[in-house]
């Protein structure tokens, strides 16, 4: 099976063309491939499939390193767009794809940048999914470590966002799994720790569902900015600094799609026998 290794700000992916080759993956196979010592190693595996809808270009599937399938990965979406172009699967500048939970438009800006229409943030608790009687800008969550105030949103996957004073002093790897697996998130959640620098600039660490803390999380950056705008602490165009690099997030507010712009880097091509 042929594959490519790619990354978006250090969030690394194994990308597989399921259009021109037959691909059958089980959770066990994905976990073996994800092993950084005995396999290829990655945060997520991205699978390019033919479109289910003739008006679209591709279907986009994402698997975490633990083998679980998820509906969204923002950094992966940028790499997906770069991959299908590099492999000659399309020559379009605007690439229309479906995911498990909706549709996306991926736009190639230049040889480095890709702009992704992430769709509208979803706030209704039942659709996140999150257990709450109604939407609120802030929710209180209690854990064994501490009680936190957070915003909750779906960008095609569930995000819980906490505002912190200093991301370097925040116990991300202790608090992250407690919130990821909190009983009010029936499908678990990605946990964002957001430090507001000013109204157009934040620093962010993300503890990803099924992957732990990664160098960058595109949908996490989108979720954090959406929550910050909804809570009134951010403006509509925000630079998000993650340990792997920076993303630019734009959102005009409720009723509008959210846009993410950032790099997508090809590392190498490979072949592995399953």
From Swiss-Prot:
Q: Which InterPro entries does this UniProt record tie to the protein?
A: DAP_epimerase_AS, DAP_epimerase_DapF
GO cellular component terms attached to this protein's record? cytosol
Q: Where in the cell is it found?
A: Cytoplasm
Q: What's the chief localization of this chain?
A: cytoplasm
Going by the entry's taxonomy, the superkingdom of the source organism is recorded as Bacteria
Q: Which residues form a coiled coil?
A: none
From the UniProt record, give one GO term of the biological process aspect. lysine biosynthetic process via diaminopimelate
Q: Which UniProt keywords apply?
A: Amino-acid biosynthesis, Cytoplasm, Isomerase, Lysine biosynthesis
**Molecular function via GO:** diaminopimelate epimerase activity
Q: Which reaction does it catalyse?
A: (2S,6S)-2,6-diaminopimelate = meso-2,6-diaminopimelate
- The enzyme's main class, written as a single word, is isomerase
**A Pfam family it matches:** DAP_epimerase
The annotated site for Important for dimerization falls at 268
Annotated pathway: Amino-acid biosynthesis; L-lysine biosynthesis via DAP pathway; DL-2,6-diaminopimelate from LL-2,6-diaminopimelate: step 1/1
The residues listed in the UniProt record as binding substrate, with positions renumbered to this chain, are 11, 44, 64, 74-75, 157, 190, 208-209, 218-219
Q: Give the EC number(s) under which this enzyme is classified.
A: 5.1.1.7
Residues carrying the site annotation Could be important to modulate the pK values of the two catalytic cysteine residues: 159, 208
What residues sit in the active site?
A: 73 (proton donor), 217 (proton acceptor)
Q: Which HAMAP family match?
A: DAP_epimerase
Which NCBIfam families does the UniProt record give? DapF (TIGR00652)
Q: How does it assemble?
A: Homodimer.
Family, according to the entry, reads as follows: Belongs to the diaminopimelate epimerase family.
What does this gene product do? Catalyzes the stereoinversion of LL-2,6-diaminopimelate (L,L-DAP) to meso-diaminopimelate (meso-DAP), a precursor of L-lysine and an essential component of the bacterial peptidoglycan.
* Name of the protein in question: Diaminopimelate epimerase
Species whose genome carries this gene: Actinobacillus pleuropneumoniae serotype 3 (strain JL03)
């Amino acid at each position: 099976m042929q594959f490519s290794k790619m990354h978006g700000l250090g969030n690394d992916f194994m990308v597989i063309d399921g259009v021109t080759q037959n691909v059958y993956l089980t959770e066990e196979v994905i976990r073996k491939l994800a092993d950084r010592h005995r396999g290829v190693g990655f945060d997520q595996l991205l699978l390019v499939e033919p479109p289910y809808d003739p008006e679209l270009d591709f279907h986009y599937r994402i698997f975490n390193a633990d083998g679980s399938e998820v509906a969204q990965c923002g950094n992966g979406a940028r790499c997906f767009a770069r991959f299908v172009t590099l492999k000659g699967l399309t020559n379009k500048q605007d690439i229309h794809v479906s995911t498990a939970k909706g549709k996306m438009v991926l736009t190639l800006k230049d040889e480095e940048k890709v702009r992704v229409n992430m769709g509208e943030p979803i706030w209704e608790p039942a659709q996140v999914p999150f257990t709450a009687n109604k939407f609120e800008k802030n929710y209180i969550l209690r854990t064994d470590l501490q009680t936190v105030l957070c915003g909750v949103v779906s960008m095609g996957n569930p995000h819980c966002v906490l505002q912190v004073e200093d991301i370097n002093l925040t116990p991300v790897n202790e608090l992250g799994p407690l919130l990821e697996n909190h009983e009010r998130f029936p499908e678990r959640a990605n946990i964002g720790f957001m430090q507001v620098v000013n109204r157009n600039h934040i620093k962010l660490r993300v503890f990803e569902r099924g992957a732990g803390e990664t160098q960058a999380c595109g949908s996490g950056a989108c979720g954090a900015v959406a929550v910050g705008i909804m809570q009134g602490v951010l403006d509509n165009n925000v630079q998000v600094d993650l340990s792997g690099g920076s993303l630019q997030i734009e959102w005009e507010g409720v009723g509008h799609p959210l846009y993410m712009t950032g790099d997508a880097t090809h590392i190498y091509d490979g072949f592995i026998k399953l």
